[in-house]
Amino acid sequence: MCAPVVWRTEAMPSVSDVWGYRAVAALAVLALTAVCLGRRLPRLHWADGVALFWWVCVSLNYVFVSPYPAAEVYGKAMALGVAYVALRLVIPFCGRAFTRLWWVGLCAAGGYELWTGFMQLAGREASRHHLFDVTGTFFNPGPYAIFVAVVLAVSVAWWYRHGEAFAGRGRWIRVGAWSVAAVAVFCFPVLVATWSRTAWVAVAVAAACLLWKAHRRMVLWGMGVAVCAGVAAYFLKQGSADGRLLMTMVAGRAWAGEWLCGHGLGGYAQAYGAAQEAFFAVRSGSPLSVVAGSPEYAFNGVLGVGVEQGVLGAVPALVLGLWSLVVLCRRGEVSAYGWLVLLVSALFSYPFALCPFLSLAVAWVALAVSLEAGAAEVRWWKRMAVWPVVAVGGWCVWNLSDNTARCVEAYEEFRRVRGVQDVAFLEDYRKKYEDLKAYPDFLFTFGTALREAGRYNESNAMLRQGTRVSCDPVFYTLMGNNYRDLGAVAEAESAYRKAFGMLPGRMYPLYRLMKLYEAEGQMRKAEEMARQIIAFRPKVDSPAVREMKNEAKKLTKR
C-alpha cells in the first residue's frame, strides 16, 4: 500500500494510479493465499458495516445522482473497497507482523522520497514543478510535504516509544533503529524547503498528542508558541490564508445546496463554481474577490466528500477516520501518529484527492478494524465462500489498471501536441476524448482547436463539457467569444457576465464585454464597462492589464 507513493504522481492520469491499482490486485492475490493457508477468518465488526454502507452509497450516487464523467472517481472507490476487504483478510493472517511491516514500509517509502527531495535541492534531479525546488515524486510540494510529515511523525513516535530498547541489541537491529532516527532527522530540512504550513501544523498536532501524557506543561507552552507562530504565519502569507478561508466558506455553501446526497461524484468543481458565483453575487466589492480562485480540488477533505456525496458520504468518512485514529492511539500503534498527520492535513489541503494517500487511509482503517474485531476459526467451505468476492474484485481492479494505463498514454500523447493549434490534430483529439473527457486542460485545448478551425458550435459543446469538470471561468469567456463570432450577442453577453461573476478578481471578461458593446454600437454600456475597468484593482499588474485599462480610457474620452 506504500508502493504508489514512490511512483510519479500527477494531477492527471499518472503512473502512481496505475501501480496503485496493481498493488490492490496483488493484495487480492495475497488475501486469497491467506484464506487458503489459514484456518481463521476475521470476525465482522460494526465498522465493516459502516464501510459497506459508505461503499453502497457511493455506488448509488454514481449510478443515480452524478451527471458528471466520474468513472475514474468511482473506479478509485471500487479499488479501495477491494483493498479494504483484502486487508481485512491479510492482517489477521499476518498478526502483529503486519503492524511492523506497515511502519517499516512507511519509513522506507519516506526514505526514498527524502533522497529524491535532496537530489532535487542539490540540482541532481529535476523538480516536478517549475516554480518550486523540491516536489519529490509529486507534482507540487504540498502533497510531498504532507507525506514527509507523515513519515516524520511515524519515525519520531517509534524512536520515542521504542528507540532506546532497540539501540542496545544486535548489529542489524541497531542499524535499523538508527536508520529510523536518520529518516526523522532528514525530514526536517526537507519540510523547511517545502514551505508547507499545513504539514507543520499537522506535525505540531501529532507531537502534542505524543508528548501530552509525559510532558503536559511543555506541550501547553508549545501550544502558546504555536499560536503566536500561527498569527505570524497568517500575516506572512495572508492572501493564501484568506484564500483557504474563502474556499471553506464557498464549499460549505455548495454542500448546503445538496446536503443529503450531494451534487454527485466528480461534481465538486462545478458545484464550487456555482456556489462562488452566488457568494459574490450578494457580496459585490468583497475584499475576498482578490484571493478567489478556481481550485481543482477541495482543500478540506470533509467538505469535499460532503459536496459530492452529502451527509450520506461525509458521516461514514468521519466515523471511520476518527474511530480508527482513537483505536490505533489507544493500542499504542506508532503509525497512528502518521494517520493523525494525514487527517489534520486533510482539513487544509487535498491529500485524499490523490491515489497514494487514499491507499494509506484504507490501510489504517483496515488495521484498526482488524485489531478490534479479531479472528475466529471457521470451516473450510466458509473460507472458500470468500474466494469469488476477492477474485472478482481483484480482476476488476486489474482491468482498471489497464484502463488507467491507456489514459496515461493518451494524456502523454496529448501533452506532446497540446501547444500546436492545427486542424490536423482535431481527429487525434477526438479519438482521445473518451479517455480524457474528465480533464479540463484537454477539453479547453480541444475547444480552442475547434474554435481556431471555425467550428464554433462544436467548440462550445466541448467547452460546455469543460464547465462540468472545472470551475475556471475561462471556459465561459471562450464560449462568449464563440457566441460573438456566431452573432449571438445575448448569449455572448451572458457568458462573459457569468465568467466575471464566478471570479470577480479577473478583469478580462469585463474587457470582452466592453469590446462586445462597442462592436454592437451600444456605447452607453461600453462606457459603463470602461469605467469599471479603469476603477478595477487587479491582483497582479501586468502589461496586458495596463493595455486593457488604456483602451478603456481611450473609449471614455471619445
Predicted regions and their residues:
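Register position in tetratricopeptide repeats
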Residues: 452, 485, 519-520, 554
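Transmembrane signal-anchor hairpin modules in multi-pass inner-membrane enzymes, especially those
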Residues: 1-63, 67-72, 78-108, 158-181, ...
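Interfacial juxtamembrane loops and adjacent helix segments
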Residues: 125-132, 265-308
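Hydrophobic/aromatic packing residues within the alpha-helices of TPR/SEL1-like helical repeat arrays
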Residues: 426-430, 463, 496, 530
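Alpha-helical transmembrane segments of multi-pass inner-membrane proteins
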Residues: 4-6, 22-34, 52-64, 72-89, ...
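Structural marker of alpha-solenoid helical repeat scaffolds
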Residues: 435, 468-469, 502, 536
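Alpha-solenoid helical repeat scaffolds
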Residues: 441-445, 474-478, 507-512, 542-547
